[in-house]
Amino acid sequence: MSRPLRPTSSSPWDCSGGVFDWDVALRKLDELNARVEDPTLWDRPSEAQAVSRERANLAAKVEAVQSIERDLKDALEYAELAEMESDEDSLNDARAQLKSLKERAGRAELEALLSGEADGNDCYVEINSGAGGTESCDWAGILLRMYTRWANAHGMTTELIEETDGDQAGIKSATLLVKGANAYGWLKTEAGVHRLVRISPYDSSARRHTSFASAWVYPVVDDNIEIEINPSDVRTDTYRASGAGGQHINKTDSAVRLTHIPTGIAVACQAGRSQHQNREEAWKMLRARLYEAELQKREAAQQALEDQKTDIGWGHQIRSYVLQPYQMVKDLRTNVETSDTQGVLDGDLDAFMAASLAQRVGHTRDGGEAS
């Protein structure tokens, strides 16, 4: 395999010395290419899959940078030619190309910052309603829809693993499995409490209500990562799955809840048709939860997740969504805000995620209007 060319020193995408060091990335890609081409690697299937996945992820980042540089060179040549010929239409086309390239470069830069141990993994998004009763249950349902739409817009797939309906509307809780490139790396920035202010559709007096719901995000654990769980530390409960009914409604105790007694971490699954399927998925979820807890300790990125969960209310907010008396979504960590509330609720979260990700890796940016 040929070694990719290094961008020129005059390239506007010079990452040397940053989180994505170009020379280090090329050396690492050479090493991974050599390992993939070593036939003895495939005697160890789990390791081979992990190496192949790491190589594909890094190769995609390198190609993204090189593609931007190639297109930038072409756009600049086109602009120079248009300027020499005083062709205003072509100049406008060149400006549009350069604007698009700037956006691509920004996205590629952020993708390069997804260098955490589990950033490339699929993930679970666990949503829970908080203070506010029916209003909060409805709000939790809106968040579930928001993240589903975000994932679908980015070519990811989703699967509803568990859902508990609210008494009157919305959901009390739900767990969404999101599968796609860097799913955990992006969605981990959404972990925290989300606050909604609106005129309640459930209040006959049309009063303004404040509601809370939380989103907690855990990486799906790769098969080659060993998470040791003593079966005697896990309590298993079964119960009847809830749902909308119909011919496929489950009339047996097929839903499964696992509780890890030492940590108090609990997971539940009711998506499968059988108790066996739900038990298997619940164990995957429990491994993911315990892995996330270990990552937090190792990276010292934030206090233990279960400590944060004690109060789904004012104390741990990351974002505020105001629909009345004015319309504004504001991230309380980065100060990024937008008045396009409907767009955000329809899954347009990239500006918030990008700012939070940049802040996490030490590339703090000024807060501003979300585009």
Swiss-Prot record:
PTM text: Methylated by PrmC. Methylation increases the termination efficiency of RF2.
Keywords: Cytoplasm, Methylation, Protein biosynthesis
Places the protein is found: Cytoplasm
Cystine bridges: none
An MF annotation (GO) of this entry: translation release factor activity, codon specific
Coarse class of the protein's main subcellular location: cytoplasm
Gene3D superfamilies found in the cross-reference section: 3.30.160.20, 3.30.70.1660, Release factor
Record-linked SMART domains: PCRF
GO annotations of cellular component type: cytoplasm
InterPro entries in the record: PCRF, Pep_chain_release_fac_I, Pep_chain_release_fac_I_sf, PrfB
Domain of life: Bacteria
N5-methylglutamine carried by residues: Q247
Family membership noted in the UniProt record: Belongs to the prokaryotic/mitochondrial release factor family.
Stated role: Peptide chain release factor 2 directs the termination of translation in response to the peptide chain termination codons UGA and UAA.
Protein name, UniProt field: Peptide chain release factor 2
